[in-house]
Amino acid sequence: AAAPSPNDKETKQKLTDLGVQRAKQWGWVNTYTYTKSLGEQLIAMEPGLRYTIVRPAIVEAALDYPFPGWVEGGRTAAPLVMMAMQGLRHWPVREDAPMEVVPVDQVAGAIILAGALLLHHEAAPVYHLATADRNPVSYGQIIRWINAEYLKDNRKIKLLTPGVVVMTPEVARSRGQLVSRKLTGIYEFLTEVRQFAQKNKLPFAKRLTKLGNNIRMITRQLSIREAALELYQPFLYDNRFIFESENIRTAHARLSEEEQRKLPWWPERIRWRHYWTVNELRGIQKWVEGESTKAYSFKL
């Protein structure tokens, strides 16, 4: 019999499941972090190879360079920011868990610095590029800051909603399933009424068709949102990651003041509320959020 194609849907799923199983076996939260660790081990095993490994946390919008808020592509936090800015209030997060985020321009400067030290045979084996060990910001703070920005743009909603609600993943899943069942019931009812209206040539049949399509779209959006939050659960709720970044601080301290200005590494100076509501939020809205995503609603 012919070997199964790696592009076959069933084979892809089996490979994905195997990757997740192996990742968890070795203590990694997903296959992404697991495969990165494999790459690092291959580098470390190479005889005679001089190397340094740079491990940035979640890389997001620029702090200053090339200008505040510059971001290319939908980075890791972009879906979460867009959910918050489109009205999502119910979040399965640990309030006190820090979000390990580092601006892209700080990462770029640190990589150049690590490379220069490697050329001089003075680099450490590993450089963590993170912020929470000196200047932590929690998920609870971030989602409330962004929700406040959302309410500024939607003042009528502010009068009707109690704000952000934090819950466990189990409660969030149960709530999502309940909403999904209700939407399915509404859609099935509308379908029956629409079919009756069409059969009897009633004037509101077209409006029922449009309403039914809207319900289907909302149900699909709910499914996408639930899948995204499930993907982020190891970071939002299951773990409390803080990465020690002493090596890059020590390296940066060796530079002159002029060199430090050219290659900045100052996480402790970041004003997080301003960063998230101006640099990150406005950067995503300007450079990432396309017309297709603006049609999606995450208010449920």
Regions found by a protein language model. Give the residues of each.
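First extracellular/luminal loop
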Residues: 1-27, 259-284, 288
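Alpha-helical substrate-binding/gating segment
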Residues: 44-46, 77-127, 131-156
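Catalytic cores of eukaryotic secretory-pathway lumenal/extracellular enzymes that build
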Residues: 2-24, 65-71, 77-95, 101
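Conserved beta-loop-beta element that borders a ligand/cofactor-binding pocket
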Residues: 9-17, 21-33, 37-66, 120-127
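Active-site rim elements
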Residues: 26-32, 93-100, 130, 230-239, ...
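Mid/C-terminal beta-alpha module of Rossmann-like enzyme folds, strongest
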Residues: 117-232, 250-254, 258-267, 276, ...
